[in-house]
Amino acid sequence: MSLLAGFAVFFAEIGMAIYNRVHAYPFGIYGAERVGKTTLARQLQTRGEVPDIQKRTKGVQSSSRKLIKIDGDVRTIRSSDVGGQAIYWKQWESDMKKRNVQYIIFMIDHRHLNKNFNMDNQLAWQYLVDVILKKRWSNGKKKKEKDYPVAIGIWANKSDLWIDGYDFKGEPSKHPIFEPFNMGIQQLNEIGIPCHKYVVSAKSDSEMVYRGITTMIKDY
């Protein structure tokens, strides 16, 4: 009996490994312009140092599959590169609805720490939160349970540029960079959507990126 159980576990693990490689988890990657969404998309496609990207993304690009490998764990995700200019924010909702996005990565940078009057990150975040909290899509169609994301990651990007510039010794998730987003996080938590805070450099640290993706899928 134990031998049969062992075989069952073995084949179950193989089946799960195949599923994780073949099944693509739909991710939505959103945020204000120039926070590093295109850099993240490039990092997920080709692992390594990403060169500076000057061209701005317009609208919603076609989604594509990305293979995520770290510590022997293999996952496949599907994501689109979506413009962060305010004129494209409405297309975040379209992307979420069309692809039935399960996981969202909302990217921010440190501009609101450098300049208190800069509200780019906060306005984009509140827009996304409002879209998710609404019980109906903008076309009036009522949302179903599957239309809500499983989890949201708030990724503080460009850490290589700002992490050492602030006298902060606590957990990265407690860093002041996340403070303006806590109210939205609480609102999402209240409807059962967990939010995961993460500090990352999409440009230069592929391990941080891949580990962040895998953690979201595993934990939520």
Predicted feature locations:
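Well-ordered, non-membrane alpha-helical segments in soluble/globular domains
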Residues: 118-140, 169-184
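Inter-motif core of Ras-like GTPase G domains
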Residues: 89-132
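Canonical P-loop GTPase G-domain recognition
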Residues: 161-220
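Conserved beta-strand/loop subsegment of P-loop NTPase cores
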Residues: 103-106, 136-160, 189-199
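Glycine-rich phosphate-binding P-loop
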Residues: 26-49
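Switch I (effector-binding) loop of TRAFAC-class P-loop GTPase G-domains
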Residues: 45-78, 84-89
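Conserved nucleotide-binding/hydrolysis micro-motifs of P-loop NTPases
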Residues: 86, 111-113, 158-162, 203-206
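Short, flexible boundary segments at extreme N-termini or domain junctions of P-loop NTPases and their
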Residues: 1-32, 214
